[in-house]
């Protein structure tokens, strides 16, 4: 169906006037300005959802004209800019003109989130690196890109080593590199919106050690050379119904306000969009893969909230849910509001690990008292309520049905040797999209065939798209967003077609499986942190001298971020205790560079599990994810009786739930895939 012709601005404005009070914008130029932000946001999962920012109840004719205008705006050619190889030199020239000798470029925006909008992708624009975590430090005579173990291979593929030396962020952190490489008396610039106070403290110490000086810059120099930089994203902000949230925004605000009052704090600055979305029961779409409305908030001890975000994107339905206790302001009002708090001598809570240093500088300059502490929404958001947990279970049933059907299809299709990584990922997404409440993927699907599976966070592109081949391992890490929950699952599959896996493949896979089962079966006392459990997932690998260079588990939100804190399961020390209602991933792995990757991931929820000696409360895990685990890669001799019992019970549950939903051929495959070991 083609796009109708655009009848012109005057005709559009006439239709907007005819919409009466339903219209939120009345001039075509305002609609065009809005569309620049719409173009910078991820595409709507629900067709024409963006129109709610223009008009509440558009007629069919008005919808057609809005679509036509959007198509016309989308067809504009992008502004040409510098080639990737020219950007580093241009940045150095800009720094020299400003009297600055170096600059720190994090992969971050003012919200410190994992997914940042296109307008904030400075690290990718400058270096070519597209991973979800990293940082660059640029000096006059050298530059380095810092990534963690998930991205070392990817960085080598994407970044010119003649421009940036690639460093492992934990083995040689950016601050240490700067301490060694910064010339004496050098001025090192940074954007205070993009670094936290803790970041700044580390870099300041490094500069002192090097005899250099760290300086905040009023304007980011990357922005001054970035021609054609996208506009800030605009996606509609909508209410999340109480039947999904399980607790009203009013109750949440009152509960957290009481916590602030008990701590003798007047207000808390919230800079994490997922915290704001959870507190207000709102969802948006400003970034890929997470339903986040970008903005800031100020929560007062009386439970009232000032919400700072572009008012154009807050729909009429969202405003109605906010009510009189929430004041909506433009982002530009944040600074003056913080100034007022300072002038009144208020005590303000801010998180030095997640809030931009700009917030702290503004509050201190205004005279406010600052209490450094964790975002007050983090912990209550992580502990899902009964309604959220019920929704998450329901989402995993739909997700598991889609994935199980896909795995049956894959077993039939892949051995022919024609299926590619990209086509497989697209097939799975289409199956998920057919389910109820689907709102997009929760992260870009990792579809890694053969050696690509060894790249922990591999992202397939048209230039890297590889066929799935017989005799190879295929790693598929995927997830989705649903109105009632967020999923994240990894399955590792052997592409048979008459071939058999090697003994090494089976050994590696089974050791990963043993670690997965050990964590899933864990029973532990209240007060235990994830770092205390991490060894359970690694032990079988360690016994063979093997290891994986990533965490074992990350927190997962409820129709929010697929990666959330404050809890995690990792070798990195973490004092946050696991609590009932927390959802976390269980994903040990093994990666043989140039050959294959193995990872088995289910989401698990912390639950109460009776009492131990002395009446101490005990906890355990409920496995949420449901999909077959590859039997062809299991060396049964390596499993003990308890491990076999766990696997057989898990597969029996999968078969019972999904067998009736499959066609005859897929049902026969599932019977074999879930047979007892």
Predicted ranges, named:
Residues 79-677:
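Active-site neighborhoods and metal-handling regions in enzymes and metal-associated proteins
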Residues 1-78:
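Domain-length accessory/inserted modules outside core catalytic folds
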């Amino acid at each position: 169906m083609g796009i109708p012709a655009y009848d012109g601005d005057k005709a559009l404005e006439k239709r907007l006037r005819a919409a009466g009070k339903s219209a939120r914008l009345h001039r075509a130029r305002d609609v065009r300005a809005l569309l620049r932000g719409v173009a910078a946001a991820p595409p709507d999962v629900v067709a024409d959802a963006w129109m709610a920012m223009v008009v509440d109840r558009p007629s069919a004719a008005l919808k057609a004209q809005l679509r036509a205008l959007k198509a016309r705006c989308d067809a504009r050619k992008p502004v040409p800019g510098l080639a990737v190889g020219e950007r580093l030199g241009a940045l150095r020239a800009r720094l020299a003109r400003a009297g600055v000798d170096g600059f720190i470029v994090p992969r971050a925006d003012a919200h410190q989130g994992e997914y940042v909008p296109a307008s904030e992708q400075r690290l990718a624009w400058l270096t070519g690196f597209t991973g979800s975590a990293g940082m660059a430090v640029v000096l006059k005579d050298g530059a380095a890109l810092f990534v963690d173990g998930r991205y070392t291979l990817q960085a080598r593929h994407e970044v010119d080593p003649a421009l940036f030396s690639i460093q492992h962020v934990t083995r040689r952190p950016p601050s240490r590199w700067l301490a060694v490489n910064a010339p004496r008396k050098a001025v090192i610039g940074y954007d205070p919106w993009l670094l936290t106070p803790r970041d700044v403290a580390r870099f300041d110490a490094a500069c002192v050690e090097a005899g250099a000086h760290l300086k905040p810059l009023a304007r980011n120099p990357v922005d001054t050379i970035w021609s054609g930089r996208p506009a800030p994203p605009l996606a509609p902000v909508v209410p999340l119904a109480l039947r999904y949230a399980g607790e009203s925004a009013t109750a949440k605000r009152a509960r957290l306000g009481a916590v602030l009052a008990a701590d003798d704090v007047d207000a808390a600055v919230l800079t994490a969009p997922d915290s704001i979305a959870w507190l207000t029961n709102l969802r948006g779409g400003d970034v890929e893969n997470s339903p986040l409305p970008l903005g800031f908030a100020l929560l007062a001890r009386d439970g009232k909230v000032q919400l700072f975000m572009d008012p154009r994107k807050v729909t009429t339905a969202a405003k109605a849910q906010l009510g009189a206790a929430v004041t909506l302001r433009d982002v530009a009002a944040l600074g003056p509001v913080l100034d007022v708090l300072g002038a009144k001598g208020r005590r303000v809570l801010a998180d030095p690990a997640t809030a931009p240093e700009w917030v702290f500088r503004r509050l201190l300059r205004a005279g406010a008292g600052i209490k450094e502490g964790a975002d007050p929404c983090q912990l209550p958001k992580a502990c899902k309520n009964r309604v959220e947990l019920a929704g998450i279970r329901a989402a995993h049933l739909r997700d598991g049905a889609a994935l199980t059907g896909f795995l049956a299809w894959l077993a039939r299709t892949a051995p022919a040797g024609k299926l590619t990584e990209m086509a497989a990922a697209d097939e799975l997404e289409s199956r998920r999209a057919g389910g109820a409440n689907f709102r997009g993927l929760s992260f870009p699907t990792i579809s890694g065939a053969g050696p690509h599976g060894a790249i922990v966070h591999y992202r397939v592109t048209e230039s890297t798209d590889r066929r799935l081949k017989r005799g190879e391992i295929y790693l598929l890490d995927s997830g989705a967003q649903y109105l009632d929950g967020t999923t994240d699952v990894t399955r590792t599959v052997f592409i048979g077609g008459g071939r058999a896996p090697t003994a090494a493949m089976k050994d590696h896979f089974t050791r990963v499986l043993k670690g997965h089962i050990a964590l899933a079966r864990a029973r532990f006392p209240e007060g235990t942190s994830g770092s205390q459990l991490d060894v359970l997932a690694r032990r079988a690998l360690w016994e063979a001298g093997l290891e994986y260079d990533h965490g074992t588990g990350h927190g997962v939100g409820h129709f929010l971020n697929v990666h959330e804190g404050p809890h995690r399961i990792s070798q990195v020390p973490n004092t946050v205790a696991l609590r009932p209602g927390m959802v976390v991933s269980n994903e040990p792995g093994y990666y043989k560079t140039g050959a294959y990757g193995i990872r088995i991931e289910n989401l698990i929820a912390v639950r109460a599990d009776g009492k131990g000696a002395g009446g101490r409360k005990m906890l355990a895990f409920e496995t949420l994810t449901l999909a077959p685990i590859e039997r062809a890669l299991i060396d049964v001799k390596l499993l003990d009786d308890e491990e076999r019992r766990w696997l057989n019970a898990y597969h029996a549950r999968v078969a019972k739930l999904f067998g009736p939903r499959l066609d005859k051929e897929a049902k026969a495959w599932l019977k074999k895939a879930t047979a007892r070991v």
